[in-house]
Structure formats: structure tokens, C-alpha cells
Amino acid sequence: MSGNTLGLLFSVTTFGESHGPAIGAVIDGCPPGMALSAEDIQPDLDRRKPGTSRHVTQRKEEDLVEILSGVFEGKTTGTPICLLIRNTDQRSKDYGNIVETFRPGHADYTYWHKYGIRDPRGGGRSSARLTAPVVAAGAVAKKWLREKFGVEIHGYMSQLGEIRIPFLDWNEVPNNPFFAPNAEILPELETYMDALRRDGDSVGARIEVVATGMPVGWGEPLFDRLDADIAHAMMGLNAVKGVEIGAGFHAVSQRGSEHGDELTPAGFVGNNAGGILGGISTGQDISVSLAIKPTSSIRTPRRSIDKAGEPTAVETFGRHDPCVGIRATPIAEALLALVLTDHALRHRAQCGDVAVATPAIAAKAP
């Protein structure tokens, strides 16, 4: 199976299955000399891990990360970093009824036709469980970006089902299980999710991710554009069905006089481009928006077929997120960090000595 690696100079390969003994990631290309320990990685894993509220899957995994290689005396050595997370709460018996059938909306049918074999336990390799090592690797990338360039990456939920969440305060995001930037709307979100669980149904979400403190110049035209690689990475996140950069699809209804971000000596006027022009970072905030579909595993019986092609009904049991978007924020942050780190190293390799007389203007004019 190919397609398990993200990045060129800072590459991450994940491994494992949902109900296997362990999952993990190998980072290749991390610069040497950066202080790194499990304590630098664990906080982001704790933000993503299951069982943290009644609104997510009740699978209980500690998601404790182990650094097996690439670090000596507390510093990265420049050699591959292997991160391991052991699975401890598998309940494979919950999937006995789907061995011979295909769950609607899942990868069961496509994996079976492509490989002629599939691991039905928790979705195997296609499970969102495999986002844990992505978050672990992303924490390493976040640390390097922060220390080397002052780049910070933060995300939040802007919509849960039909409920739009007005942005009020970044400080509210870590204080609730929805990663919502608005404490006033939490009771409505709680009530909404409680009713959804009672109905045995699921719902989608919209996630926003922002990178601040960006320098100018990261990105490679034409087919390795920074925005293209961001979209590529984000579409690798389970359940993502749409990615917007900056104004995104709203650009369709804008006029050029509105959409084009003017430049002044004092800074940019607007950021409809989402911090990227011609596939290269402008020095403004990079803004990304993700559309996440409803969880496919629901208790409502659904029509499907079995391996013989005969009609059947599938009712999913087990422990599942009624909205996978609730835990998606730290994953999206990690993916953005991985792409930015890769492009930072690529820029340094080819254009690190380039200097121009034109000053870099402020990301936002006063």
C-alpha cells in the first residue's frame, strides 16, 4: 500500500491499524539540535484523544507517545524520529457483523475492490485512529516552526451541523470540548449533540485553521504550490470533503476590485488570498477552512450489499464519534504544520540566500 507518506524534505510516514497493537509515525528530515521530549508532543495528543467528553467516541485510549529514535540527550539528531502510540482499548468483537458486508459511507467497499483484503476491525488502516500519529508528528513540526520562525498555528470549530459559531475569543477554544471560540453558544451545542446521539445519527462540521507570523516566500510553483500542498494534506484527513484557502468559494461572488488584496507601504489591505499568492506565502496569516462530512457509522439501519453482491441492511455498533469534526481541530493544525515545515526547509535549500531591496510589508495595514 502506497500513499502513506506526506512531505518531501520533512516527511512523515504513518503506520498501524485501528485495532492493531500500536500505531505510529516516522519523521525523516527533522533538523538536528532541537530540544525534544514526549512532553512536547503529549499536550496535542491529549487534545485529540478519544473519551474526553460525552460528545465523542467513548473508546478509552491514553495515547501516550514514545520516542523510539532520532533523539539523543534530549535533542533531535537529524536521523529518523520514530513515534509510537500503543493501542490499549480495542473491542474488535463490535465489528463481527460487518466482516461480510460493506458499511455505507466507509472505505470498506473501495478497500475490498482495490486490495482484495481488508481489516474490518475499526476500519483498519482507514480509521480516524490513524490521525493520532499525525498529531504527534505535527507537534514536532509546530515546535520547530515556533522556535525557528515564530510561526504559530491555531484552529477552531466555526460550524457544527446547522449551527454557525460566531468567533469571539481564541482563549475560549481550549476551554470546551468543541474547540469553539464562543462560550455563549456552548449550551446550544451541548443540547444539539445530546439530541443527535439519542437519534442515533451524526453530523458534519466546519473547522478553521490559521498560521500567524508567516514569512514571505514559502511555496514552490507550479504543481507544488503551498496552497496545493495544504489542500492535498487536508484532504488526507478522514471525512474532509472540502478545503478553502482564504475567501475560498466566496471568491466566486466577489469582484476583482473586492477580492484583490491591495498592497500599501503600511501593509496589505485585506487577505482574501489566505496568505498565499502564486502558490507562495505573502507573509500574511494563512487561513484554511475544512468541510467535514457526518460520521458514516450510525445506529440507523442502512441499505448495503454483502461480498456476494446481495442486498443487506447494516446497523453499526461500537463506539463512534457522532461528529468527527469535534476532534478534528488539532489534526488540521498538525497537517498545516507539517506542510509549512516541509516548505520552510525546501525554501531554505534553494532560496535561503536570496535577498531583495523591497521591504516585506506588514501582514495587515493599520
UniProtKB/Swiss-Prot annotation:
GO MF terms held by the record: chorismate synthase activity; FMN binding
InterPro entries found in the cross-reference section: Chorismate_synth, Chorismate_synth_AroC_sf, Chorismate_synthase_CS
PROSITE patterns reported in the protein's UniProt record: CHORISMATE_SYNTHASE_1, CHORISMATE_SYNTHASE_2, CHORISMATE_SYNTHASE_3
Reaction(s) catalysed (UniProt annotation): 5-O-(1-carboxyvinyl)-3-phosphoshikimate = chorismate + phosphate
Binding site for NADP(+): 48, 54
Cofactor note: Reduced FMN (FMNH(2)).
Involved pathway(s): Metabolic intermediate biosynthesis; chorismate biosynthesis; chorismate from D-erythrose 4-phosphate and phosphoenolpyruvate: step 7/7
One cellular-component annotation, GO: cytosol
Protein EC: 4.2.3.5
Lipid biosynthesis found in the keyword field: no
Top-rank EC class of the record's enzyme: lyase
Alphabetical list of Pfam families matching this protein: Chorismate_synt
Recorded superkingdom: Bacteria
Protein family (similarity comment): Belongs to the chorismate synthase family.
NCBIfam families to which the protein is assigned, alphabetical: aroC, PRK05382.1
Function: This reaction introduces a second double bond into the aromatic ring system.
Name of the molecule in the record: Chorismate synthase
Organism annotation: Ralstonia nicotianae (strain ATCC BAA-1114 / GMI1000) (Ralstonia solanacearum)
Gene name linked to the record: aroC
